[in-house]
Regions:
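Conserved ABC ATPase "signature" region
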Residues: 63-64, 111-130, 181
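Helix-to-loop junction immediately C-terminal to a conserved catalytic motif
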Residues: 48
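A short, proline-enriched helix->beta-strand linker immediately N-terminal to the Walker B motif
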Residues: 153-157
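Conserved ABC ATPase signature
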Residues: 134-138, 142
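Catalytic Walker B motif of ABC-type/P-loop ATPase nucleotide-binding domains
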Residues: 159-162
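Short coil-to-helix segment of the ABC ATPase nucleotide-binding domain corresponding to the Q-loop/switch region
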Residues: 92-101
Length: 245
């Protein structure tokens, strides 16, 4: 389980997170939505341990990640996979080497076992036969898929997605949504998806939490979120509909 309790964060005098509390049960997908600047990515950084709250606690499997020693924090992160907004592939490495990198740096697997694992993960994201290509030779959607393959290559218990469909057209966005849902079922992981795309939220989320002015104003099932009468939630939903018409 991942749990945030009364997390507060200020940056340059502005309160970005204001007593945020959120529980993500093991094996579920929590989607965090909100407008730009609402604190979505800052929340993700707290969960990863890249930022420590000014007050409050962030627990991952009952361990307070901003109080543990560096080695223990590294161990916690070793059980996380992260899909960055851009895919974050290393430009001078092939797709294969990008995906193999965590295995080479963090495990004692031999090259034959690494190759088997990389090919397996490429197949899971429908990128068979692309391992020798360079990032510059593949589309934005394929970069995201390769980034996802790298995120899951060490069998993480937790996967974090930062704007997974950002910059993609609607067709490619839905294909990434399908992959996220498939990974959840096949790997039985706990997932957190930060997005501004409600189509993604409705498709992959067990629950949707919305950040507004640094606070969680709703934490609900996709159905209840869509039907919620809170004016801030309704305005966000309506703005999404307008953007897609």
């Amino acid at each position: 389980m991942i749990e945030l309790t009364d997390v507060t964060c200020e940056l340059t005098g502005k309160k970005i997170l204001d007593n945020v509390s959120l529980k993500i049960p093991e094996g579920q997908t929590m989607v965090i939505v909100g407008s730009s600047g609402a604190g979505k990515s800052v929340t993700l950084k707290h969960i990863i341990g890249l930022m420590a709250p000014d007050s409050g606690k962030v627990l991952v499997n009952d361990k307070c990640i901003h109080d543990v020693k560096a080695r223990e924090l590294e161990n916690i992160r070793n059980h996380m996979g992260i899909l960055f907004q851009s895919g974050a592939l290393i430009n001078w490495m092939s797709i294969f080497d990008n995906i193999a990198l965590p295995l080479r740096e963090k495990t004692d697997l031999d090259e034959s076992s690494i190759a088997d694992k990389v090919r397996e993960r490429l197949a899971m994201v429908d990128m068979q036969g692309t391992g020798e290509k360079m990032p510059s030779e593949v589309s934005g959607g394929m970069k995201k898929r390769a980034g996802l393959a790298r995120a899951i290559v060490r069998d993480p218990a937790i996967i974090l997605y930062d704007e997974p469909t950002s910059g993609l057209d609607p067709v490619l966005s839905r294909s990434i949504d399908t992959l996220i849902a498939e990974m959840q079922k096949r790997l039985n992981v706990t997932s957190i998806v930060v997005t501004h795309d409600l189509n993604t939220a409705y498709y992959v989320g067990d629950r949707i939490a919305m950040l507004h002015e640094g606070q969680i104003i709703i934490n609900a099932t996709p159905k209840d979120f869509a039907e919620n009468k809170d004016p801030v939630v309704q305005k966000f939903v309506e703005a999404q509909h307008l953007a897609q018409t």
